[in-house]
Amino acid sequence: MGTYLYLLKYELKTIVRDPLSLYMCSFPVILLVLATTVFPLLFKSMDAANDAALRVTMLIVLLVVLTLGSFFLSLLTALLLVENKDEHTLATIAVTPVGTSGYIRFKLAYIYAMSVISTMLVLFGTKHIAGDEYAIRGVSLFDNLSVLDIVSFALVNGLFVAALALFQSSFAKNKVEGFAFIKGTGIVALVPMLLVLDSFRDELQYALGVLPNFWAVKGMLLELVPMESSANLSFPAYLAIGAGYNLLLLLVMYRTFLRKVTY
């Protein structure tokens, strides 16, 4: 236990010393500030009678809130893992009692915890501080969102953060390649934005299902903004599929990362 506490202190010092890492780690707080102050000003500047435009704008904002906060934590994890590979830190850790696999599991565990906490912080904060601002015809979209909904989404979304971080860091040999690969895979965070289009509200929505973050985001979006469609699943079903998919991807990428490091 003492070894892992020492590692945690080391990881936190590494993050605090690097301005970029510190920014990525604090992005959920920045997002919360935007969601409770800036975005509501955008809604107020729009014509309240134009329900369609207001609805689309809120959908886009909610997708940003649901996806970007945790995505930055995956970038942080990927960069830290690439740095470990680039500086041969993992080779040193391999001969310690923790071992490389133990260290990777530890890193994923605390990043997963950070992701879950940050997601709940953003959603609970937005709901309680500015929930009434996210309203159409006087009805707040956050009225549909329960504590269990937020916690469930955060737990599933955290799996995606860990899986994506391993995917991004597995194929990069150094920091330069790491930045390039991260930029290339960054589109994953933006693709769910297509859900605002009418064409992706029925069966075609499942074309986006290849993306591991689609399932939890889609389920949460339907809780916030209910949309009638025979193609839609229930909220628990979306989360269950998302959890299974991300766990499988996490296992595959964990083994891939260790194989890349070992050989």
For the regions a language model picked out, list residue spans one by one.
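Short hydrophobic, aromatic-rich alpha-helical segments embedded in or entering the lipid bilayer
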Residues: 2-6, 198-230, 236
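Hydrophobic alpha-helical transmembrane segments of multi-pass membrane transport/permease proteins
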Residues: 15-44, 59-76, 112-119, 182-195, ...
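Transmembrane helix boundary and interhelical loop/hinge segments in multi-pass membrane proteins
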Residues: 49, 74-96
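Secretory targeting signals
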Residues: 113-160, 166
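A structural motif at transmembrane helix-loop-helix junctions in multipass membrane proteins
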Residues: 19-23, 149-187
